[in-house]
Amino acid sequence: MNKPLRYAMNVLSVRDYSEVEIRRKCAAYLYKSEGTESEADEAIAQATAEDVEAAIAYCKEHGWLDDARYARRYISSRSRKGYGVQRIRMELSQKGIDKTTLTTALNESDIDWCILAKSVVERKFGHPLSDEWKDKVKHQRYLLYRGFFHEEIQSIYTNFSD
C-alpha cells in the first residue's frame, strides 16, 4: 500500500471529503514527507502524481470517495446551520464539486429555503420581526450574507403574517 493511499484512507476514515480536497491533501502530504523542495526531479513528481491518482481511483472503487454523497451531506449540514443556497453553492464549488453534481444534490434536498430563512432571522433577531424599515434592512443584509436569495427574504414579510 503506497503512502497516498494510506493517507487518503486515514483522512477519509474521519469524515467525507471531495475528490479535489483529497487530491490536494495527498499532494501536500507527499510534498512534506518526501522533501521534494530540494529534489525537484520530474520523475519523482510524476510518480507521486500517479500514486495520488491511483489512491483516488482505489477510494472511489471501494465507495469511500463519492462527490455526490459528499455534496448531499454538506448541503444538509450547512442548511441546518442556517446557510442558504447561494452560500452553499459557492462553498461546494470552491471544494471542487462540479455544477451538475451540485445542482442534482440541491434538487434532491427537500429543504424549504423560505421557512429556513424565516427561522434563521427569528433565531438571530427574535420572534416577532419588527416592521421598521431599519430592522428590515438589517434582516435583509444578514440573510444575504448567509446566502439566501432576495425572493426568499421577501417571502418572510409577504408569506408569513405572524
From Swiss-Prot:
This is Regulatory protein RecX. HAMAP family: RecX. Keywords: Cytoplasm. Pfam families: RecX_HTH2 (PF02631), RecX_HTH3 (PF21981). Belongs to the RecX family. GO terms for cellular component: cytoplasm. Modulates RecA activity. The keyword Mitochondrion does not apply. It comes from the Bacteria. GO terms for biological process: regulation of DNA repair. It is found in: Cytoplasm. InterPro entries: RecX_HTH_2nd, RecX_HTH_3rd, Regulatory_RecX, WH-like_DNA-bd_sf. PANTHER family: REGULATORY PROTEIN RECX FAMILY PROTEIN. Its main location: cytoplasm.
